[in-house]
Every structure is written in structure tokens, then in C-alpha cells.
Amino acid sequence: MRRALLAVLLAPPLAAALLSLPLAAGTGMSAAAVGPLPDKSDQVVQYAIKVRLDSSSKQLVGTERLTWTNPSGDTVGELWFHTYLNAFKNTRTTFVKESGGQLRGDTMVSDSWGWIDVTSIRTAAGTDLTKQLVFAQPDDGNRDDQTVARLPLPEPVPPGGSVTLDIAFTAQLPRVFARTGFKNNFFLVGQWFPKLGVYEPAGLRGRAAGGWNCHQFHANSEFYANFGAYRVEITAPSTFVIGATGERKHEHTNGDGTTTYTYEQSDVHDFAWTADPNFVVVSAKFSAAQDVTPAEYQRVAQLLGRSLDEVTLSDVDITVLMQPEHLAQSARHVQAARDGLKWFGLWYGRYPYKTLTVVDPAYGAGGAGGMEYPTLITAGTSVLFNQWPLDRIRAPEAVTIHEFGHQYWYAMVANNEFEEAWLDEGINSYSTGKVMEAVYGPSSSMLEFLGLKMGEVDTLRMGNSPNAKFNRIIANAWSYTPSGAYGFYAYQKPEMVLRTLENFVGEQTMARVMRTFHERWRYKHPRSEDFFAVVNEVTGRDFTWYFDQVMRGTDVVDYEIGAAGSVRVAEPRGVIDSAKGRQLVTDADAAKRERQAEEQKTAKYDTTVVVRRRGEVYFPVEVAFRFAGRPVERLTWDGRDRTKTFTFVRAEKLEWVDIDPDRKVLLDVNWLNNGRRLQGDSRPAASWASRWMFLVQTLLSTVGLL
């Protein structure tokens, strides 16, 4: 979710410096080896699920036929499962302990627990394995946590072999909290069935030996799973409107007041669905021919160094399921979905699925808002955004585009969100910001409200602080301390890392980095090192020094002006030897010469500027100097030493000095100490102060209104 601005604006549910750097192989920007986007994933799992929703008891009763194909060279003797809904079973679960019953601005209701029971599990031959299923706690040893289960198999699965299981389960949905559940007759059904973990072969994500990767459900962790094919039959009361992952293939009205809907989707790693009798269905289409102009195709092809065929998109059917009171905003949601399909598709590769469903959660279902599942996303808005002036806040658009963006990272690239959340959340925050800027402009991408404009960078840096140095970006999602730090280290700081990188390598090079990464790793589960390798390859430079500091380290960037001043060059006094011989220059003689220099405007000034690195992280920066009546001079500092002194002898005094004048280093925790003005017009500073005061007042009043 867009945590920077939305956490402030919305109540639930809305709630030349680099030339000195070491080169990688080759020089300049390399021509990365790029192949076409993969058409299909390696389908390791096949799910055929039948589920019935009891809207009164809020329970699911289902059966699941699961086929798993061993992707490794190992003989595998057990399967590991996620039973996510057990995270909401009681106060002893790891999820509830870590969250304290509060997450993403939502509070768990103590009388509405959730759970899942596997009532039967058999092999295709009929062997009953139900009693063999045991819970495991691989992360924290909490014996009360039942979100992971291990199943020994009667016969091991050889390399390339398969096993099929028939599973029956009953699940109790909690009141909406943390991505799933119900609110009255609104249902978001996510992480709801017994789901296999990932058996990682040796070499995948750097593993030395093959093994299961199946983490417990933590408060700040999301998901990781193999790609496969899903066929799901959902039976619900006929009065309910259903939306789900994938394409609806069949609809059958039963004789008991229910209807069964069949959905199918391949090349995905999860399946979620929603139900609500109050949904208003808004149908639309993204047209690759009408929603993208020939000129836009041409510009993007040139930007990326790709052919027109490679950047040409496909049509997509869009379904928006709106709450009746938000129907006036349906066009905004549709357009945001179109904008996401357009720009993510152009920049990173065509969307490979035929459908996209956008869900508007019911009032009070805050825990269901701002969430992503394959081909299905949840947004989040308020009736207040129906009316001027709050309709100028782009919250519905930002949430919709951000959640759609996850289709490209969480859903297609599919990193392990438990262990490296930034590869989804951070990269998606960066790419969402780029889309918002492309659509609305960089100065007003987030807000255009009563004369105030706010862009992505304005909101992004709100959480940056000299004290934000206690966690590494690359870390297990549940390890950030305090737990609220997850948003900064998984979302905001990685986006600043990427934008800082872009500011130095250039927009075109960064666009090619991102395109290459997505093309190469679609459907393949990369790790951080794979992204870093693409950066080094495409830029032709080794950025290991940068990523080691900002991704694996905890320190911050902070440059400041230590001292700055201009002093009149005094005429010499005393016994002076010169070509004319030895002369005695008295104080009166020197003073006279100084007055003459002033009158003739030939006086000189010694200017000294001391710049300092307060933070531990270094980054090359420019330092800009403005002398009275002269053009700005820019010099490069590699930023490595603690201090550097610049000296000048000029006929003019120094007016101002500024480190990183273009504000390329978004990671700098304090831009206020980057500059110093010695003389000249102070009105620009006053103007900025007024704008920020207005910003603060506007935000506070907005929060009050909501």
C-alpha cells in the first residue's frame, strides 16, 4: 500500500561523479543480453479446488486436489504446507503476538477468530495421511503457532516425479483483518486453502542444497509460492456478486439458492476471491490500440532500446466491483487500472493475463483494502473523495495503481516476500511513483489540492530521518524493529535507493535496468543479488559499493556545510621584496591601496568552504558555488572523506553554496543542512517555508475531516 502519503491522509480503510567509480566488464552502458518475455512459467503445482461459502456462519467447506511436481534433482520425502488462516486462531499465534492484534491501521476483533482444519488428506490411491500431518514452527519455535504443517509421504517423490493428494478442509473466516476475512456480507477470501510451500532446488536463490522454504505467517510478512495452474469452483448464495483470480469459465445456478462459478488461471502462484451482494459491477476494457498512441509506443521503444513488437501490449478485460456509495468514483478506478496496464506494460513487459479485477472493499473492511493477489487487487477509498476539494487528492488512483503494480513484481517476478520484502514492495513503490508521475506530472502526482501540489518525492521523504538507521533493508520481514519500521525499510527507503541510483545513471539507463530485470526474472523467483547483477550489467559499472552500504548496511547519508565565508584579500604590510627592490609598506600605505582597489573594483576575496560528511554512507555529490554576479560553478566531491575544503580567490564574494543542488541523493536524511546563503535574496527560502507551512496545515485539516 502507498504508506508514505496515505498513512497521513487516509483513515482506515484507506488508510559526473560516477565517472570515477569502478567499471564492471566493459565501459559505458552495456547492451544487456535480453530475450523475449517468457510465455509460461514452470508449473510446479496444479490446484483443483471446490469451495462453498456459508454466508451466515462465515465458513468455507472445500476439497482440493493438489498435484506437485518435484522441480529438483533431489528425492523428496515430505511436503510442507501453509495453513495461513490459523494465524487468526487465538492470542498465542506468532502473527497475533507480533502484531498485538493491530496491523495496517486495523484492529483485530477479539470475538471473531479465524482458522483452518484439514479434515482429510489422502493420496490419489486412497491412502489416508490425515494423522501424519503435523504442525511445525521453523522460524520461532512457537509451539502454539499452526500456520505451517509438514506431511511425510508414504513414498518419496523422485526428481521430476509427481505426487497427487486429495484434501478436504473447513475454514472459519475472521472479521476482516490483515488481508482476509468478512465484514457483514462483504468477503475477501485470501490465503484460505492448504497451500504448498516452495521446494527450492540447489542453486535457486543461492541455496547450497535443496530444501523446503515454508515460513510461518508473521505480522509483517507476505507470501512466496510456486507457479502453477488453478481451477476453482466457488459456490455462494445466488444473491452475491463474485470476483476472483483468473477467467470465469462457467456459471451454474443450483437448485438450493446458490450458484457455482468456475474460474481458471495458469501461470500464477495464488488464488483469491471476493463476494458481496452489494457490489456494483463496472466492466471496461484496456485497448492496446486505443489506450496507447503510436507516438507513445515509439518513444518507449526508443527509451528501452526495444523493437515496437516487444513493447506492444495486449487487450485486457477490466472488472471493477464498486460499493454503491463510491459509484461516482468508478471512472477514476477504471482509469487508474488502465494507466497501470499501460505504463507497467510499456516499461516492463506486456501483462500476460486476460483479466484484471479491482475490488472496492465495504465500509469498515479496512483490513481488506490495498492488497494484491494474482489478477485481483483491492483498492480503498471514501465517500469524501466524491466531492470537491477532497476529490483532488489522488488516493484512489495511487492505491489502485500501486496494487496493480504488484502484478509485475509480487505476482510475476515472485520473489520471496518473507525474506526480501523490498524486491516487491520497494521496487513496486518506485515503479508506482514513476507511473503516477507519467500520468499526473512529477510535481502533482500525489496531490493537487487547494493550490497545493505534492509529488512523489515530497511524500517519499516524509519518513526519512537521521534516526532511521537501526535496520537493514535486506532482512526477514518479521525482523524489523520496531515492527512499524517495516513500512520504511520495505517501501520508502528502497524507493529512495532506486531513485537516487536513477538520478545518477540517468532515466534511460534506469528504465533499461528495470526492463531487463523484469524480462529476465519473470516467473523465476530472484533474490537481491540478481537485481544488483542486472544493475551492474546494464549500467556497465560496479555498484557493489553502493548496495553494500544502503541495502546491507544500516547507516545514513547526511552531508552538510561546515563553514563558508569570503574575506577581503589584504594588501601586504612590512618589508616587501619585489622587482622594484625592497619596500617598506606601512599600515597607511596598505590601507590606501585597499581603498584604491575598492574604488577601481579590483579587490580580491579569499573564499573558503568546508563541506562535511556527517553520515557513514558516502555517495558522490556535486557542490554548487554562486559568487556575486557570476554563473554558478559546480565541482565534484567523491564524498568519501569526512571533510573537504574548497578555496577560491575571486573578485566577488560568495553568495551561497549548496551540496547536491539538484537533490539527486534522496537518501540524504537532512537537506536543510546542505546549503548556506551568505548574502543575496532570502525570499526563495521564505517562499518554501510558507509552502511547507501550508502543507502541514492542509494535512492536519484533512486528517480532521476524515
Predicted feature descriptions by range:
Residues 300-305, 370, 376, 425, ...:
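Acidic/His/Gly-enriched intrinsically disordered linker/tail segments
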Residues 91-104, 170-226, 230, 282-287, ...:
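Glycine/proline-rich low-complexity spacer/linker segments in large multi-domain proteins
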Residues 243-244, 543-544, 556-661:
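Beta-strand-rich binding/interaction modules
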Residues 196-212, 218-401, 430-433, 442, ...:
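Hydrophobic helix-coil surface modules that form long, contiguous segments used
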Residues 326, 350, 443-444, 487-576, ...:
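Amphipathic alpha-helical substructures
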Residues 16-61, 220, 544, 559, ...:
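N-terminal, polar/Ser/Thr-rich
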Residues 69, 104-185, 222, 640-654, ...:
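A surface-exposed beta-strand-loop module
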Residues 78-130, 239-240, 626-631, 649:
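Solvent-exposed beta-hairpin/edge-strand motifs
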